[in-house]
Amino acid sequence: MPTLHSKILGEGQPLLILHGFLGMSDNWKTLGNKYAEEGLQVHLIDQRNHGKSFHSTEFNYDILANDIKQYIAEHNLQNCIVLGHSMGGKTAMQLACSYPELVNKLLIADIAPKFYPPHHHEIINGLKALDLNTISSRTEASNELAKHISNAGVRQFLLKNLYWVEKGKLGFRFNLDVLADRMEQIGENIDASATYNKPTLFLRGDKSEYISPLDTDVIKTHFPNADIQTITNAGHWLHAENPKEFLEKSLTFIKS
């Protein structure tokens, strides 16, 4: 089986960072460098069907967690701290519950262990409407995408995935067809009986609805040692919207 693509920064205890749906390891480069400066060996990982990692029709959280298990083995990593955002948070939860011996501490950014109804249709439809055979620049792609996605920040996030497949031809790094087809799986919960008893921190954005006060019980059911903290002035992309507070709270947890 092919291995996941990653960028490794710094030296020290391994910190594995898992991006969200339609994201990539590069989304975490700025914070990754900050963690590396604090004496951590940061692994910015592209999950399957994302970034520079391999494409596959097989896609669910058991499989994604298994990919990370294999990555840890291939890199001979011990005592890992795992940080996952959104879809990457679900992967991280499943990994920690299935293979607790591999995960020393767990950090989850703005996602709870529950089912989320598919809600990315607008984004997927907008991306599918782009005819990359006729689009010759990022600006043109952005203008076309704006007809479907009004939020400039979301457009910029998505267009980070554009690259030159060959001279004059743009393509997406993510596997759009499979991800569009697997939207139900993205929202799925981790295994119902899954638990992880080691230190766990959930960080939620105060402007995000992904983790509500009602989710405390379900979080504690799966993660009895979980602490839930709020990042101010931040929505679902809390690490990008308030990186200073995200870094402070996450480092306090990592170093405790």
Q: Language-model segments: what does each one mean?
A:
Residues 1-16, 37-40, 77-78, 223-224, ...:
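Alpha/beta-hydrolase fold catalytic core
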Residues 7-54:
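Conserved HGGG/HGGXW glycine-rich cap/lid loop of the alpha/beta-hydrolase fold
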Residues 37, 41-83, 248:
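Active-site loop/oxyanion-hole signature of alpha/beta-hydrolase fold enzymes
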Residues 84, 88, 92:
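Gly/Ala-rich beta-loop-alpha elbow adjacent to hydrolase catalytic centers
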Residues 94-97, 104-136:
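Flexible "cap/lid" loop of the alpha/beta hydrolase fold
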Residues 133-187:
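Conserved alpha/beta-hydrolase catalytic His-Asp/Glu region
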Residues 167-222, 227-230:
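Conserved serine/cysteine hydrolase catalytic core
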Residues 226-256:
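Catalytic active-site module of serine/aspartate enzymes centered on a nucleophile-bearing elbow/loop
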